[in-house]
Amino acid sequence: MCEERAVPARGPAKEATHMPRKLFCQLCPAAYAVSVAKQCAMRRLQDAAAHTPFCTRQQALLPVVLYRHKSLIRRTLGNTRPELQENKAVNLALAAPRVNGALLRPGQVFSFWHMVGSVTAKKGYREGLTISGGQACSDIGGGLCQMTNLIHWMVLHSPLTVTEHHHHDQLDLFPDYHRQVPFGTGTSVFYNYIDYRVRNDTGMAFQLVVYVTEKYLCGELRAQRPLAVKYHIAAQNERFVRRNGVVYREGEVWRTCVDKRTGNTLSRQLVRQNHARVLYDESFLPCVEEQQPGPAARGKGSAAP
């Protein structure tokens, strides 16, 4: 499963014991639109001030394929409307040509939104699945997180540096459906200030190839020459645990760098520590029962002699 395109939470906050103060963006739809426009403008100003060296597209392909991956476009995600999956297929087909061929020369930055641009109905984008405030909803351009998920998974198998990566706030929103990659390696994007960005800190060029078929979103990560190392990404210590009636998905995602010639492990990096609240029916999950101690119990301890 991959997380879908996220949007900032709209509407009033949920009730609490005391009523929290509303944010400006929660006052009304107009206030929300103003807040989004402000964030977009701020991101453009930041990039202009920093003189960010964005990458561009190149039609000619680099010779070496470092990694390939594909993900099923139409998937069953909880009780979401099937037409949102069909609309996502349209959205991915529109965005893929704008990313395909992205060439990262040394020192350059890949920005998903710099490549794709704004997603509007006028451009043909449709209403797809989004995540807002930890809940499934829909918006124009929804589903594009599947593309950044694909790109991120390929980038993890390379020496490229991820400089901006957002998650869905440690929530497990849908049951696994033909999962191909570890939980927690997904992404969250929203035009243009919640971005996915990668910088090339190496001495050679890399290239992203992204395209769609009838069933799959496909990708390749290419380079000028082969790497002397290979990368393995794996989940460890995964489990579902129930604490005080709430089920969480826990685990770790590790990346191991191995020397191709000797087979020796060169480095091991913790990519993600997962502690995600499960928001779907957990009755079929193999849960470990744990009782979290209350404040009084946590405050007790053995006295020093």
Feature map (PLM): residue ranges:
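Compositionally biased, low-complexity flexible segments
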Residues: R5-A13
